[in-house]
């Protein structure tokens, strides 16, 4: 499961996600990717499930980049405990994702395989996504 090796603080405030992604919104490594269209928290397990779905469909061809990392700690109080008495214990980590943020990138496979692989990955994620292609990608000459 994805999580930071060490954090400065064990607990963090929930915060508020507003606006679109200012960074991580351009394809940097691959020719294809999926981009988030809404604000959501994505857990490390969801990221890993999506990554496995992509690599299995691509049959270990090409390369996959995960552009988000769950570094925000989430706390939870035990069951049947009254409100108050401090913040709960850390339960796991999430990656806050805003609209426009790239989640996965792929390189080294043909267009149709990349599109289907990323569609399978998108089904594992709690956000609505959009398939994106590099602007200078040559659709006629698909030399993957």
Swiss-Prot record:
Disulphide bridges, residue numbers: none
One GO location term (cellular component): cytosolic large ribosomal subunit
UniProt entry tagged with the keyword Ribosomal protein: yes
Name of one Pfam family that matches: Ribosomal_L16
Annotated stretches, region: Disordered: 1-22
Biased composition (Basic residues): 1-16
Membrane-crossing segments per the record: none
GO biological process terms on file: translation
Gene3D superfamilies linked to this entry: Ribosomal protein L10e/L16 (3.90.1170.10)
Lineage top rank: taxon: Bacteria
Stored CDD domains: Ribosomal_L16_L10e
GO molecular-function terms, A-Z: rRNA binding; structural constituent of ribosome; tRNA binding
Keywords: Ribonucleoprotein, Ribosomal protein, RNA-binding, rRNA-binding, tRNA-binding
InterPro entries the record matches: Ribosomal_uL16, Ribosomal_uL16_bact-type, Ribosomal_uL16_CS, Ribosomal_uL16_dom, Ribosomal_uL16_sf
Family under the similarity heading: Belongs to the universal ribosomal protein uL16 family.
Function: Binds 23S rRNA and is also seen to make contacts with the A and possibly P site tRNAs.
Description of how the protein assembles with itself and partners: Part of the 50S ribosomal subunit.
PANTHER family linked to this entry: 50S/60S RIBOSOMAL PROTEIN L16, LARGE RIBOSOMAL SUBUNIT PROTEIN UL16M
Protein name per Swiss-Prot or TrEMBL: Large ribosomal subunit protein uL16
Organism name: Parabacteroides distasonis (strain ATCC 8503 / DSM 20701 / CIP 104284 / JCM 5825 / NCTC 11152)
Organism placement in taxonomy: Bacteria, Pseudomonadati, Bacteroidota, Bacteroidia, Bacteroidales
Gene symbol of the encoding locus: rplP
């Amino acid at each position: 499961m994805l999580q930071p090796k060490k954090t400065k603080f064990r607990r963090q405030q929930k915060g508020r996600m507003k606006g679109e992604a200012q960074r991580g919104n351009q394809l940097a490594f691959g020719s294809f990717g999926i981009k988030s269209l809404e604000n959501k928290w994505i857990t490390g397990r969801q990221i890993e499930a999506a990554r496995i779905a992509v690599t299995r469909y691509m049959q270990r061809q090409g390369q996959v980049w995960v552009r988000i990392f769950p570094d925000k700690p989430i706390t939870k109080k035990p069951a049947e405990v009254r409100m108050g008495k401090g913040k709960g214990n850390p339960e796991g980590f999430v990656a806050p994702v805003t609209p426009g943020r790239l989640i996965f990138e792929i390189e080294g496979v043909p267009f149709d395989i990349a599109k289907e692989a990323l569609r399978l990955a998108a089904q594992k994620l709690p956000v609505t996504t959009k398939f994106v292609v590099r602007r200078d990608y040559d659709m006629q000459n698909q030399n993957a």
